[in-house]
Amino acid sequence: MQKTEQDIDKTNIAAYIQFTNIAPGATRNEIEDHLELCRRYDFQAAMIAPCWIPLAKEMLSGTGIKVASFLDFGMGNAHISGKLVMLESLMTLGVDEVDYAPNMGFFLSGMYDEFRNEAELMVKEAGDLPLKVMLQLGMIKSKSEKVRAIRMLEDAGVDWIKNSSGGWPPGATDASVEDITLIRETITGRSRIKASGGISTFDQARALLNAGASLLGTSRGVEIVKGAGAAQNPSKEWSKPY
């Protein structure tokens, strides 16, 4: 259900945020700090790299905060056999939600059957585990082809469709009201929407939720909750909002 501006304010927006730290050089201490912030602000989920899932499960136990992770981030061109093994591994670790990158090369080549079949196999392997697909809308040039990709993924049974991976590889674009609206107008309601990429202020976050997103992926969760925007965030390696 689409939210209204009256429904979303600084007191409840944390419930829509998957607070993200997937920095390749993130240390254990940095991840522990990240998870403490998840607890303090009661974010919907902590999005962290697979290697930190056991730590996150331990630190967030009993909080109701979900542990989310990813596979084949950005690239999406691992063979499906490898993706299925990675998904099984994440499930064994106890992950609550998984974001995965589809093979955009298949779609852009017109290999639509292969693109859809990959999604169907991932959905089958995931079972009841919420699965989000990082559709790189910025790589698709025409609106009609964007609609085709969205419909294929929903028809395959994917639980969530994202506008992009959020920050990498080149071609991954920031979340926009236009893209979120397009997804909302295309899906039938079987899939839900997660917005990702460049989300750094409260007003931006609220606009994306009002456009149809039900989750936000961002490394700027604290700034958004405080309504401060990205200006207060110190410059760091891998600082692009996810």
Segments and roles (model prediction):
Residues 1-33, 178-192, 199-242:
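Alpha/beta catalytic cores of nucleotide-metabolism and tRNA/nucleoside-modifying enzymes
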Residues 1-92, 152-154:
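Conserved N-terminal beta1-alpha1 strand-loop-helix module at the mouth
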Residues 14-16, 45, 64-68, 97-99, ...:
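Structural preference for beta-strand elements that scaffold enzyme active sites
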Residues 18, 56, 90, 133, ...:
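Conserved, mostly hydrophobic/aromatic
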Residues 35, 39-55, 73, 98-116, ...:
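Glycine-rich, proline-tolerant flexible connector loops at the mouths of alpha/beta enzymes
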Residues 50, 54-75, 112-139, 155-156, ...:
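Alpha-helix-loop-beta-strand connector modules within alpha/beta enzyme cores
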Residues 57, 78-92, 140-152, 185-195, ...:
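Catalytic cores of alpha/beta
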Residues 69-74, 92-107, 155-172, 198-235, ...:
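Glycine-rich phosphate-binding active-site loops on the catalytic face of alpha/beta enzymes
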